[in-house]
Amino acid sequence: MQNIELSCITDIDEFHSLRESWNTLNDRSANGTIFSSWEWLFSWWETYQHDADRQLFLLICRRDDALIGIAPLQILNHPKRYFPCSKQLMLLGTGETDGGLVLTEYLDLIIEPGLESRVTEEISNFLLEKQDMWQGATFQQLLADSHLSKLFGGQRLSIQSKTIDNGFRTLIDLPETYKDYLMSLRKKKRNNITRMYTRLQTEQDYVVDTITDGLDTDVAITELADLNRERRGQLEQPSAFECPNFEAFHRLVVKRLLPLDKVQIRILRIEGKAVAGLYSLIDGDIMHAYQSGFEAELGHRYALLTMMITQEISHCIEDPRLSQFNFMYSADENSYKLRYSAYTEPMYDLNYFPRNKRTDLYQFLHGPVKQRVKLLLKKR
């Protein structure tokens, strides 16, 4: 059996040089997604490397010089007072400290098919040997079949693991025709979509501009950000686009994904004014609806968010590459997204903490105490 060589990359220039081999492996890996692509994670590191005290910690597995495994990790150094550990192992693309969560979902180890067990074991052994470099770990928004769930399998650990439910991804299996899709909806929803679309067509002379047909990416991001801020403002919720790093990251990653035909931004205009926008990611046979926004008055009169989503679903049905439409993260299993004939799949966080009293206190405060406070606040 051929030996696997494992190395640790901490230098951004070495990370940059991995682009081609990284993406080749990511495309082959069973759990590889656009969120584990080089374009997404390198752009994230370029943007967020100075957001906090972070250290790049990429674990690279090779066999006969061929790349066969990647653990896309970082070490986040917290203040010494942090409970329950100050050196936290995390996945790249997660752990932003400025409030602008990028939501890099479904991350995992990137492994050559057929070598999952061996590569996971090599990574586990390396991490245990280097445990002086980290004290705990948090891996967020994993799916049920994650390779990370098998990390440290069979090992006697000085750390303890805990899984915590963390929302759902919400999917639509695309039918053969858009008519079939409409018929899958409840009658009230279907009639509302048809009525609003007819109203928009008869009352307004509108156009939809796209970045794949010449709309400048920076213009598109600026307009989308403004519309997202307006939408979130109506809901009295903060917009991630208020955070400069979040917007900078997306300006960067969209420009890298566009030549690969893996991104789309649509801006709907009425009388030249941007009134609705949808930002989507093309990931193999899945379209991820990532961010959206709309202008208040016209947005409600024509249900513009619904229009943008259902028209995007129509485009997906016509695209032979695509078989699923993904609304991405929902905190609630019974989200409004289910009205679009969607279904949910659970996600979870996997945490590793030291076995000590500080951990017990941390878990108590962030478990029953935190939930109790949330309930009390809801009753106010």
Regions found by a protein language model. Give the residues of each.
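N-acyltransferase acceptor-side catalytic subdomain
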Residues: 1-380
